[in-house]
From Swiss-Prot:
GO terms, molecular function: enzyme inhibitor activity; oxidoreductase activity, acting on a sulfur group of donors, disulfide as acceptor; protein-disulfide reductase activity
Protein name: Thioredoxin H1
Recorded GO CC terms: cytoplasm
Active-site residues, Swiss-Prot/TrEMBL: C40 (nucleophile), C43 (nucleophile)
Location within or outside the cell: Cytoplasm
Tissue-wise expression: Expressed in the phloem companion cells of leaf sheaths and stems.
Species whose genome carries this gene: Oryza sativa subsp. japonica
Amino acid sequence: MAAEEGVVIACHNKDEFDAQMTKAKEAGKVVIIDFTASWCGPCRFIAPVFAEYAKKFPGAVFLKVDVDELKEVAEKYNVEAMPTFLFIKDGAEADKVVGARKDDLQNTIVKHVGATAASASA
């Protein structure tokens, strides 16, 4: 069973997160994690953009982690500001975008996933 394509998968516990990470690593897919918080205004601003990128770049796995819900995961990756977008390749951190910076986020996705659908970008 492959990870869902074209959607953002919200992880609500560490087991769920670990399962998604393992599945993506086995499939050779880049994982893009949106570290967010319910109280974070910029996070709410960028969430629909992140969801749009999940549709545009089905070759990657898009995960959403609430830092208050999964503190241990946020601490593992040294997340200190929200939103933080972490790029994981082959189980290791490959890149990071901090802040609701739409263009930087898209450019980093293209860099790691490929320009699969970049021509359809806004």
